């Protein structure tokens, strides 16, 4: 099979975004180099629904990945798509604060309480609803849009 040449990758059609998962820094670079409009990634902790051994990012890799993607015109979303523990929501809030400080373009969230935190503390941050949020009707989707933009 022929290897993809990043300079030969056709642009994504107008109005569409190619959003790709990035479970590691090499995967992020491959997605960016092969035409991704956006990559999404997660931390190696309980804030990430895909927290599997050998995957995901520490803070240094996230910083490198964000820089790499942004230098090439690609957006970066961080998935904080699990539900905070009722007795200890601080790690999820801290992860969102860190994501903002590192320059992510948006966060992907499941928990409405964390969405509210994001809307209140980071009003310019784009919030995306994760599939773990389970908005399965037009009414649910409209609720999220009305509450969080």
Q: What kind of region is each of these model predictions?
A:
Residues 1-149:
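Non-catalytic helical/linker scaffolds that mediate oligomerization, partner binding
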């Amino acid at each position: 099979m022929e290897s993809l040449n990043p300079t030969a990758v056709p642009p994504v059609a107008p109005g569409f975004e190619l959003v790709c998962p990035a479970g590691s820094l090499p995967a992020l670079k491959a997605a960016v180099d092969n035409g991704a409009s956006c990559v999404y990634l997660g931390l190696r902790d309980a804030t990430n629904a895909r927290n599997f051994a050998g995957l995901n990012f520490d803070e240094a890799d996230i910083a490198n990945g964000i820089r790499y993607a942004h230098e090439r015109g690609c957006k970066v979303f961080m998935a904080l798509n699990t539900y905070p523990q009722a007795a200890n929501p601080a790690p999820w809030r801290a992860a969102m604060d860190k994501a903002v400080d590192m320059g992510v373009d948006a966060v992907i969230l499941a928990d409405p309480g964390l969405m509210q935190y994001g809307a209140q503390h980071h009003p310019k941050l784009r919030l995306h609803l994760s599939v773990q949020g389970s908005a399965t009707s037009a009414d649910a989707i409209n609720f999220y849009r009305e509450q969080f933009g």
